[in-house]
Amino acid sequence: MRDNLFIYLQYLLPHALTSRLVSKLADSENKIIKNHLIKLAIKKFNINLVEAKETDISKYKSFNDFFIRELKDDLRPISNDKNVISSPADGVLSQFGTITDNSLIQAKGKLFSLESLIASSSTTNFTKFATIYLSPKDYHRVHMPIDGKLTKMVYIPGKLFSVNKITTSKVDNLFAKNERLICYFDTIIGEIAVIFVGALLVAGIETVWHGKIAPNYYKDIQTWDYNSAKFNIKFNKGDILGWFNFGSTVIILTSGNNVSFKFEENQNNIKIQVNQDLALITE
């Protein structure tokens, strides 16, 4: 009953307005406001500040600046093996596996289509997926899982339902309903996609090459083509791609049949860290 009420209230909320108000508050550089919000978040979400490069909260210019904090150097070691695909984020590996009949697993007994996720009937050769949920206490920067060249970026406007165990099990096509940013890369295994999924109270999605894109900065689908000769945006595995200002979800799509996850496919809700081995590229 409580779960259904929680979902119903989210349908009534003005998602975009709520997230914009949160964004404005989170960007405030008023010392009293931002320090209070940071202390509140640390206590509420049990944030491990010891891992942060900057542990003095007074040094953060805003609440958002704190939420996209950097980690201490070498805290998340990464494999140099080119055949290892790394986790792009700290969080929980909620679902992963093979894309079957153009469908991905959202939660136990609940599927959604690849076509609806990327808002295109051209689903290329995507065969595997991994979904990582970032809670408010997690490190919020998103890193490149494999060496690659940026070819395209697509912004898809949508709702901003919260993302958690309740909504993933109750809201149909949650990840295909929410606002999202899809970044396509050319890699040694073919095309991959790194998808930033927005959520309620997420005060923004930013990339290192474009800047802030969400929430709801555009009313229609927007596409940026980086495949022309004037662009040559390359990333090494582990490089920072962008970040969330609060928390949400990252979905990775990979091509081909030579990707094998390092976990059993009947596992889910696995705690994972950025740069940790996620999958292997097999011969």
From Swiss-Prot:
One Pfam match: PS_Dcarbxylase
Entry-annotated residues carrying Pyruvic acid (Ser): S248
Gene Ontology annotations of biological process type: phosphatidylethanolamine biosynthetic process
Reaction(s) this enzyme catalyzes, per UniProt: a 1,2-diacyl-sn-glycero-3-phospho-L-serine + H(+) = a 1,2-diacyl-sn-glycero-3-phosphoethanolamine + CO2
Keywords noted in UniProt: Cell membrane, Decarboxylase, Lipid biosynthesis, Lipid metabolism, Lyase, Membrane, Phospholipid biosynthesis, Phospholipid metabolism, Pyruvate, Zymogen
Keyword Lipid metabolism applies: yes
Source organism superkingdom: Bacteria
EC number: 4.1.1.65
The record's free-text note on cofactor binding: Binds 1 pyruvoyl group covalently per subunit.
EC primary class: lyase
Membrane-topology descriptor: Peripheral membrane protein
InterPro entries membership: PS_Dcarbxylase, PSD-B, PSD_type1_pro
GO terms assigned for molecular function: phosphatidylserine decarboxylase activity
Subunit relationships: Heterodimer of a large membrane-associated beta subunit and a small pyruvoyl-containing alpha subunit.
Name of the protein in its database record: Phosphatidylserine decarboxylase proenzyme
Gene (name only): psd
